Amino acid sequence: MKLDKSKQKEINKICVVGLGYIGLPTASMLAIQGYKVIGVDIDEERVKTIRDGKLIINEQGLMTLLTGAITSGNLVVKTEPEEADVYIICVPTPATADKNGKKCDLICVLSAVNNIKPYLKDGDLIIIESTIPPKTTEKIYDDISKNTGKNIYMAYCPERVLPGNILKELVENDRTIGGINKKSAQLAKEIYASFIEGNLYITDSTTAEMVKLMENTFRDVNIALANEFAKVSTELDINVWDAINLANKHPRVNILNPGPGVGGHCISIDPWFIVGSSENAELIKKARNLNDDMPKYVASLIIKEFKEMGICNPKVGIFGITYKGDVEDTRETPARAIIDYLLQNDFEVSIYDPYAKDFEYPLNTIEESIKNSDALIFLTDHSEFKNFEKEDIKEISHMMKNKIVMDMKNTLNHNLWEEQGFNVKLLGDGKSWIVKTL
C-alpha cells in the first residue's frame, strides 16, 4: 500500500523507540512507505550494527527491507530520540518474580516514555506496541498530560507476529488498535494502514491491551491442558499423541501438542500480566504454573529413567535449545531449566542447535554432541531434526555409547530410529518409559 501524500504532510516524522524483533522491522517498513523515521535504541552496539547495514536478528527478508530503508535516507538510527510527530514504543516488558508468581516490569516502557517527554508538543501521537497490563496506556496518558501539559493523542496497538515470519505477518495479519479516544485510534489507524493489508479493528486502549493478553493466554492455558494430558497418559501407559490425534477427529475439538515447557517472549510471560491485574485469574495462574513446572517434570523423568536403566553419570546430547523450531530465539526457553537440572544431577551435557547463536552454556557441533553419548534428547522441533534420514541415523548410531533417544516434541521419525536399534522414548507415551510417575 502506497503512502497517501496528503497524510505525509500531517505526519512528517516518526520516532520508533526500541529496535528489536518488532521495532526494527516496523521502523524499516514505515521508512519504505515514505515516512521519515528515526529509529532509537539505547544499545550503542546495536545502533552501530544497524547503521552499518547489518542485521541484529535473523529474519527472512529483513536485510533487503533494512537496506532499502537506510539507502532511501528515510531511516536514521540513533541512541537518543528527537522531535517527531508520532512516537512508537517497541521495548521489552519482562516479567519479574513477585508473591503471586511473576509481574510485569514496566521499567523499559516508562523509561522510553520519559525519554520522549522533552520532545512532545501539542497534537503528537504516542503508540505503544509493547505488551502491557490492562489500563497501562491510560495511566501513562494521564501522567504525560499532568506532567507536561501537552495535549497529545495516545493509542495501544500490540504486535501480533511470529519470529521467523515477521515481515509477512507484519503486513498480512489483522491488528487491533485501541485509542485513549476515537481521534487517537483513528490517527494510529492511518499510520498502520500505510503498510498493513490485514483488517484494522478500532477499540479503546484497555480492551486492546486485554486482547493481546487473551490471545497468548488462550494458547498457554491450552498447552497446559495438553501437558497435563501427557503426564496422565504416561501414568496410564497411553500414547498421548495418538489419543490427541483421535480426539481431534471430533469437529469441535482441537487439542494442542504437549512439550517440555513454554518459552518465548510472549506466551510464557503475558498471562502473568492478567494474573497481576485481577484476583479472578485462577485458571490462568494454575496453567502458567503447570507450564513453568514442565521443565522440572521432564528433567526428573530423564534423571529417574537413567537410574532405572542403571546408567550412572550419563553423557547426553541436547538437540535444540531455542524456544520453538527453526528460530534463533532462546528467550524463556524451557531447555535452560532442563539443562540446569541435569547438570545438578551429575549429567555431562553437550548442546547442539543449528539456529542458536548465544547461550549460557557452550554450544557444540553435532558431532561433539553425539560422540560417546548415552542418549540424544530432542527439546526443539527444528526441521533439520525432522529430516534425519536412514543413513544419517545409521552414522549417528555408530558414534554413540548407548542407543537411546528421548523425543520431547514428537519431532523424529521413530520408525527410522528404531530400525537402527534405538530405544526411543517419547514425552507422553507411557509405553516407552520405565518411570510412570514422579
UniProtKB/Swiss-Prot annotation:
<dbReference type="InterPro" id="IPR008927">
    <property type="entry name" value="6-PGluconate_DH-like_C_sf"/>
</dbReference>
<dbReference type="InterPro" id="IPR014027">
    <property type="entry name" value="UDP-Glc/GDP-Man_DH_C"/>
</dbReference>
<feature type="active site" description="Nucleophile">
    <location>
        <position position="266"/>
    </location>
</feature>
<dbReference type="InterPro" id="IPR028359">
    <property type="entry name" value="UDP_ManNAc/GlcNAc_DH"/>
</dbReference>
<feature type="binding site" description="in chain A">
    <location>
        <position position="263"/>
    </location>
    <ligand>
        <name>UDP-N-acetyl-alpha-D-mannosaminouronate</name>
    </ligand>
</feature>
<feature type="binding site" description="in chain A">
    <location>
        <position position="409"/>
    </location>
    <ligand>
        <name>UDP-N-acetyl-alpha-D-mannosaminouronate</name>
    </ligand>
</feature>
<feature type="binding site" description="in chain A">
    <location>
        <position position="216"/>
    </location>
    <ligand>
        <name>UDP-N-acetyl-alpha-D-mannosaminouronate</name>
    </ligand>
</feature>
<dbReference type="GO" id="GO:0016628">
    <property type="term" value="F:oxidoreductase activity, acting on the CH-CH group of donors, NAD or NADP as acceptor"/>
</dbReference>
<dbReference type="InterPro" id="IPR014026">
    <property type="entry name" value="UDP-Glc/GDP-Man_DH_dimer"/>
</dbReference>
<dbReference type="InterPro" id="IPR036220">
    <property type="entry name" value="UDP-Glc/GDP-Man_DH_C_sf"/>
</dbReference>
<protein>
    <recommendedName>
        <fullName>UDP-N-acetyl-D-mannosamine dehydrogenase</fullName>
        <ecNumber>1.1.1.336</ecNumber>
    </recommendedName>
</protein>
<feature type="binding site" description="in chain A">
    <location>
        <position position="219"/>
    </location>
    <ligand>
        <name>UDP-N-acetyl-alpha-D-mannosaminouronate</name>
    </ligand>
</feature>
<feature type="binding site" description="in chain A">
    <location>
        <position position="22"/>
    </location>
    <ligand>
        <name>NAD(+)</name>
    </ligand>
</feature>
<feature type="binding site" description="in chain A">
    <location>
        <position position="41"/>
    </location>
    <ligand>
        <name>NAD(+)</name>
    </ligand>
</feature>
<keyword id="KW-0560">Oxidoreductase</keyword>
<feature type="binding site" description="in chain A">
    <location>
        <position position="323"/>
    </location>
    <ligand>
        <name>UDP-N-acetyl-alpha-D-mannosaminouronate</name>
    </ligand>
</feature>
<dbReference type="GO" id="GO:0089714">
    <property type="term" value="F:UDP-N-acetyl-D-mannosamine dehydrogenase activity"/>
</dbReference>
<keyword id="KW-0520">NAD</keyword>
<feature type="binding site" description="in chain A">
    <location>
        <position position="212"/>
    </location>
    <ligand>
        <name>UDP-N-acetyl-alpha-D-mannosaminouronate</name>
    </ligand>
</feature>
<feature type="binding site" description="in chain B">
    <location>
        <position position="252"/>
    </location>
    <ligand>
        <name>UDP-N-acetyl-alpha-D-mannosaminouronate</name>
    </ligand>
</feature>
<dbReference type="GO" id="GO:0000271">
    <property type="term" value="P:polysaccharide biosynthetic process"/>
</dbReference>
<dbReference type="Pfam" id="PF03721">
    <property type="entry name" value="UDPG_MGDP_dh_N"/>
</dbReference>
<feature type="binding site" description="in chain A">
    <location>
        <position position="131"/>
    </location>
    <ligand>
        <name>NAD(+)</name>
    </ligand>
</feature>
<dbReference type="Pfam" id="PF03720">
    <property type="entry name" value="UDPG_MGDP_dh_C"/>
</dbReference>
<dbReference type="InterPro" id="IPR001732">
    <property type="entry name" value="UDP-Glc/GDP-Man_DH_N"/>
</dbReference>
<dbReference type="Pfam" id="PF00984">
    <property type="entry name" value="UDPG_MGDP_dh"/>
</dbReference>
<feature type="binding site" description="in chain A">
    <location>
        <position position="161"/>
    </location>
    <ligand>
        <name>UDP-N-acetyl-alpha-D-mannosaminouronate</name>
    </ligand>
</feature>
<comment type="similarity">
    <text>Belongs to the UDP-glucose/GDP-mannose dehydrogenase family.</text>
</comment>
<dbReference type="GO" id="GO:0051287">
    <property type="term" value="F:NAD binding"/>
</dbReference>
<feature type="binding site" description="in chain A">
    <location>
        <position position="160"/>
    </location>
    <ligand>
        <name>UDP-N-acetyl-alpha-D-mannosaminouronate</name>
    </ligand>
</feature>
<feature type="binding site" description="in chain A">
    <location>
        <position position="324"/>
    </location>
    <ligand>
        <name>UDP-N-acetyl-alpha-D-mannosaminouronate</name>
    </ligand>
</feature>
<feature type="binding site" description="in chain A">
    <location>
        <position position="46"/>
    </location>
    <ligand>
        <name>NAD(+)</name>
    </ligand>
</feature>
<feature type="binding site" description="in chain A">
    <location>
        <position position="93"/>
    </location>
    <ligand>
        <name>NAD(+)</name>
    </ligand>
</feature>
<dbReference type="InterPro" id="IPR017476">
    <property type="entry name" value="UDP-Glc/GDP-Man"/>
</dbReference>
<feature type="active site" description="Proton donor/acceptor">
    <location>
        <position position="212"/>
    </location>
</feature>
<feature type="binding site" description="in chain A">
    <location>
        <position position="21"/>
    </location>
    <ligand>
        <name>NAD(+)</name>
    </ligand>
</feature>
<comment type="subunit">
    <text>Homotetramer; probably dimer of dimers.</text>
</comment>
<feature type="binding site" description="in chain B">
    <location>
        <position position="331"/>
    </location>
    <ligand>
        <name>NAD(+)</name>
    </ligand>
</feature>
<dbReference type="InterPro" id="IPR036291">
    <property type="entry name" value="NAD(P)-bd_dom_sf"/>
</dbReference>
<feature type="binding site" description="in chain B">
    <location>
        <position position="250"/>
    </location>
    <ligand>
        <name>UDP-N-acetyl-alpha-D-mannosaminouronate</name>
    </ligand>
</feature>
<comment type="function">
    <text>Catalyzes the four-electron oxidation of UDP-N-acetyl-D-mannosamine (UDP-ManNAc), reducing NAD(+) and releasing UDP-N-acetylmannosaminuronic acid (UDP-ManNAcA).</text>
</comment>
